[in-house]
Structures are given as structure tokens and as C-alpha cells.
Amino acid sequence: MPYIGSLKVNQFRNLADVDITPHSQFNFFFGQNGAGKTSILESIYYLSVGRSFRTHLPQRLIQDNTDRFLIFITLYNGTQFIPLGVERDCHGDRCLRINGETASSWSLAAKRLPLCSLSAMSHRFLLDGPRVRRQFLDWLMFHVEPSFFSIWQRLQRSLKQRNAALKAKLPLGEITHWDKMLVEDGERLHQLRQNVVTEFKPLFTQMLQQFLPAYPLIGHYFRGWSEKYSLMEQLQINLKQDLQRGYTQAGPQRADFRLTLGDLPAQDILSQGQQKLVTYALHFAQGLLLKEKTGISPIYLIDDLPAELDANKRDCVIDLVNCLESQVFISGIDPNEIRLPPHSTLFHVKHGKVAAL
């Protein structure tokens, strides 16, 4: 089980100088709104994937009146602790270092530091467009399917080139030149996603039964083009409309994973709190599948766990996370709202300062 053995954060949001030793299992950060609780979780997330889960404007992550931020951890990988850190300045330059060496790609950090992030807006998983749900599936494949990332990268390149040709209204031959590569990688990506969904669904059902036994939701995977046609046939059928719109309408970039109860979308039936529990069930099942396939448990970041959940559901979440045998970082306002297990560390966050209790 990977876990963070130490965490240092400098000049990130309102965190001027944080240096803590997290517990290898449960860590609960409490304090008033604006104290910096979420920023702790956000800093770990940024180190893993190179972006924030709160803003698309990275300059906002740098503390006021400073010119850079630094995030540094020591990460236990099962045999030893390795250093992992990132520095970003106000000009947009950033440096990621893993085990003392500059990393060429953020995918190297994501591989070493697998995270499942559950933010205060997690219920939006069901409400937002399909992109977030594709990312959910692709996270799994990135960690369990060795061939996924190279396939995904090639697909993005061919799709970008085809869309540029469509937008520029180039001759048909220059547009369809990209179809063969797009189809080859698109079909392979679809098959990987389909395989992952098949393995994932029973685990999701198992998790959902713990949270919402009265709501037997069903997951449906849509590959991104009609079941009646191959991807090549669909591209040929859509070519005229693609030219009019300036982009490729069909393909794995349009895939989705939707949840229904009977014939109705889950988001039309469930309350906001129930949607939050569904998202928890999805991500806990995600972690279970990762552990089944690789023996590695992800680290969980759970922001504002108590919000919209009654005491029984909060306890249920804690019990399930405990069974996952993962390191967990949880935030909330009141420590009395969470029944933490004995193997926990409580941190008080106030005005950007963090102290273990």
C-alpha cells in the first residue's frame, strides 16, 4: 500500500509553511471555512496530476505576495520511501522531481501516486457532461492496462489532426488520411474500456449496496458511436456533418458511463446527498478494482465528508474506507462529526497553519 510519510507545502494558497507527518491510514483535517483544509488535499492532488481540482488558473495557487509554491512528499512504495516534489513559479515554469531526478512527464508522478479524489462537488459526477465520466474510466485503465496510455496519446494526436483538417475544410483525402489510425486506436481504446467496465460493475454494485440498498442502479457504457456500425463506417456516414461542424462527432472521445434506475437517469431520482454517496461508491469500487488488478490501493482525498450526510452514512463511509486499507486524507469543520478509527491522526487547520493533535 503506497502512503505519504511526510508532506511539506510552501506558499500554496494560504499555506505558507506546512510540515506534517501524516498517519499511514486515517488523517482528518478540521477547522473553519477558509482555514486551508481543502488546500492540503489540493496540494497532494496537484503533485499527482499537475493540476488543481478547484481552479483552471494555476497562478491562483501561488500565495499572495510570493512568486512560487513548493510541494514535497516522501512516498512509501512498499519497499522504501522516495522523494517526490514540484515547484511552480509565477511565470508558469514548473519542475517535477521524482527520486532526485527531473521527470519528463507528469504521468510518472500519477503512476507512483495513485489518487482517488472526492471533492465537495462530487455529486456533479452524475450531473456534468460525459467528459468527467470518461476520465473516471480512463483513470482505471491508466493504472491497470499497460498499453492504455500510448493508445490514448496516439488517439489524441490523430483526432487533433483530423479536427484541424475538418475545421480548415481541407480536401477529403487529407481529412480521411487520419481515419485509419483513429479507427485502429479508437477500437482498441473502446475494448479496453469495455473490459474495465465489465470488471468494475459488480464491485460498484457491492459498494452501492452498503450505501443505498433501496436504489439498485445500473451502469451503462456507451462507446461513442452507434452499435449498428463499425467506427470506420460511422466516420464515413458522418463525414458531411463533420465538415459542416468542424470536428469529429463520433468516436471514443464521445464515450460515456451513465447510471439509471429503471428507465430514469439516476440524477433525476436521487437527492444531492444520495448522489454524493453514489459517487463515493463509484470511487471505492474504483480503488477495489485497482487493488485486485495490481495489489496497489490508491490514496483517498475526501473533502468535506460530513456535508449532506447523516451520522449513519458518515460512519458507513468511514467503515468502508477502513476496509479498503488505503491512506485517507479527510477534511471537515467539526472533528466530532466523524467517528475516526484508532489508527488516525487529527490535524487542526487555522489561518493556513496545520498542527497535529
From Swiss-Prot:
Residues noted as binding ATP in the record, renumbered to the chain: 31-38
Gene3D superfamilies membership: P-loop containing nucleotide triphosphate hydrolases (3.40.50.300), RecF/RecN/SMC, N-terminal domain (1.20.1050.90)
What this protein is called in its record is DNA replication and repair protein RecF
Instruction: Look up the record and report any one GO term of the cellular component aspect.
Output: cytoplasm
Q: Which organism is it from?
A: Coxiella burnetii (strain RSA 493 / Nine Mile phase I)
The similarity comment for this entry is: Belongs to the RecF family.
What molecular functions are annotated in GO for this chain?
ATP binding; single-stranded DNA binding
Q: What broad taxonomic lineage does this protein's source fall under?
A: Bacteria, Pseudomonadati, Pseudomonadota, Gammaproteobacteria, Legionellales
Note the PROSITE patterns from the entry.
RECF_1, RECF_2
